[in-house]
Amino acid sequence: MIPRPADSLREGFSKWTDDFNEIRGLFSEMLEEEGDADLAAFLRSCFDDACAPRELAALPAEYCQALSIVFQLLDIVEENTANQVRRRAEDPRRQEGEPGLWLYNLSDLRQRGFSEAALRSAMDQTSVEPVLTAHPTEAKRATVLEHHRAIYLLLVERDNRRFTEVEAAIFRRRLKAALERLWRTGEIRSERPEVESEVQGVLHYLRWVFPDVVELLDQRFQHSWSAVFGTAPPNLPKLAFGSWVGGDRDGHPLVTPEVTARTLVLLRQGALAVARERLRQLGARLSLAESEVPVPEMLCDRIAILSRILGAEVARKAIDRNPREPWRQLINLMLARLERVDNADGYASASEWIEDFEVLETSLVEAGARNVAEMDVRPAIAQARVFGFHLATLDIRQNSQYHDRAMAGLLRAAGFAKHDFPNWSEAEKLEFLNRELQTLRPFTGPHMNLDPEAAHVTALFRELRMHLSTKGPEGLGPVIVSMTRGVADLLVVYLLAREGGLLVETEGGLACELAVAPLFETIRDLENSAGILDKFLSHPVSIRRPVNDVVVMLGYSDSNKDGGVLCSQWSLHQAERELTAVAKKHNTRLTFFHGRGGTVGRGAGPTHVFLEALPQGSLTGKMRVTEQGEVIAQKYANRVTATFQLERLLAGVTRTTLLHSVRPQGDTHELESIWPRVVEISFKTYRKLVETDGFVTFFRQATPIDAIEQTQLGSRPSHRSGAGTLDDLRAIPWVFSWSQARFHLPGWYGVGTALDWLRRERIDDWKQLREQVRVWPFLSYLLHNAEASLMMAHPGLMRLYASLVEDEALSARLFETIFEEYKLSESVIEELLGNSATRRSRLALAVRLRRGALDQLHQEQVRLLRAWRREPKEDTLTALLLTVNAIGMGQKMTG
């Protein structure tokens, strides 16, 4: 990878700090004009190096809100700066380029010897699907995000315009007004959001952001391909979107079958709205007249075909609307069929619709209007391929234990004497499932009284059956079984689906019309995953599935919470390698679904580096990846940023797929032989901590987890079943709590002891590790992520939060254990990688700019935690939640 030249970094840092100082100065000026001179002075003391910090006995609520807003402004400035720096890097005169994007990757692949034909083939094989999920600790309200976008667009306007003196003065007032609107908008949710409002949040991106982004993506791909190869580009690699919002019911009782059915309707309505809008835009542009342009026969033929399908009256209206303008006439006919999409004369599928688009494109090229075809119609085709008539696939996720209880309810209703299905052994379950999966006979009828779990699952599958029968399979993602512990957890879904009519008779026997996907989350489940998948793919019902693909989801969050970051990452790495071999054995195309979150403790990290670190041969062109709550807003709220993120993902998956295709599958690094022992030490170190007597007490008192559980940040409860145990706690609030207390423990704990053992006991291996750390992508990725967590941690604040633990002996003992591991982790990583602040200058600057203000907020949060735990008043909780929100903004993460 070619590093970006130092002068670009210096320019970027200079612009970042200058713009931040300017916009926060304007915010302070606005506060002073409103009579808040003391608050303005306080803000200067928090962010100006020249001003001494102000020590306050308590922070008023508006001070916390003001700090939160300044953090938001810093993020907006950083995003705009990054986009401007990338734009400059793409200037051919600078000869820099942006690593990870199409132009860079295509050039790199060509230099490596890949032919144009090989790349065209790879484009056909590549499929990338970001899956949008709700986030139980997403802190930003939709209204606040709208204000953020308005401010961002003002900064973009300023950078791309030359103002007169009058225009500059007016612009300054516009920016100040935008800041005032943000300042006067409440940030804390007054009540927990409904699932329906979260669905609308996802629809916003799918309906209003991504369609424009797809057009930009296609245009940038066309330019890059032509620049590298000088030939007509192939189609953009397949991009699709998925969603969990309205379909993910794991520990979420508010996601009912009715909510899922309504979500599918909303997604389809959104897709058709996007389609109509695109056709109308094309109709406005394609005014080519038959008197000026030769009309290809294929265009006339298609107009005649659609006219016959629609009937004389409808066709006449469509054609008469634009006499002597045949391209518009075809568009009018396409619009008419689109409006009748649920009728016999409407489009039966999106593929039919795309065929008509292709006629538009080809006929324009044939008529000599190639530029119009490439700039107007080709992006419309790209959009149609992405969104179809479904907008995004909706995944259905449920916990394996819930399915077991549902099965028990069905057995009870059917009169089985032995109906305690959750307590059966794996062998008993398999014997029963194999027998039952030979018949279409359901257990229950439509009007039988069922236990809640059985009633829910049966109603859900009936809704999915209805959708499949009327709309087709395109809008449905897989049924994901979280906490998959054995093959019975997957096969039971087939049997439950039978109750909804989703098992069908084929020539060879029964098959299920829904894809079923395991989700492996704990360390043990990852270790057993290959054996489970092998048995699943060997089952007759699986063999007869409609498509010879399988999706396997990997849980980064829970595996980290279970075994620590080093053990988690290695277990995932090994599982991918073994699962890939199983899929190859069954001649099945495997799609890994990476359940990565927004923090290191939940699998985050730069996309292109993450792809490089994947096991050889594990990426065969298809990838799904979660995009969660706060990450969705950070990556996709603004179109330029969204285009960059998706281009890097598409280009990166294409590049990695090609590189994997020419290297031996299972190819290992020479250092891997020592790694199992390192992982074992890390795992034991981490488990020793979380299993220590009193650890749960320490966690609950030294972090604001109890306050976080009171927030209204997301519709999902923070615990799966309400048990209140550490095992039952979701990974997101677990990570969020540690980040609020500035431990960032899930991102680094266990790394220090494990690598220090190598440094002390295996000196030659340690020396080799130091020499090769940057050429083993897996290790480099892991250590860089752990390093980032260590840079975000703050020992002084860690100690302050530990002082909240009532048992002083427990506090001292566990804090000392954690702090020693922190120092050890810092030591080994610095010895392997070098000085963090020097190498990670952007992150170091981000931490430095936020430090003074965050210190004030942490002090206030600790004070409020003491007061609230002593006397739980509502106004104290409200103030406490303001600090939770502000600290989350300040660290740019909510778990």
Model-identified regions with their sequence ranges:
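Acidic, glycine-enriched catalytic cores built around paired aspartates
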Residues: I2-S68, E79-Y104, P237, R385, ...
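Conserved phosphate/anionic-ligand binding catalytic regions in large, soluble enzymes, centered on
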Residues: L239-T260, D376-H403, E521-D525, F593-H608
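Catalytic or ion-translocation cores adjacent to nucleophile or general acid/base/metal-coordination motifs
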Residues: V255-L286, G500-K684
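Extended, charged alpha-helical coiled-coil/arm scaffolds that mediate oligomerization and mechanical coupling
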Residues: D345-E358, T362-G368, V372-R385, H390-Q398
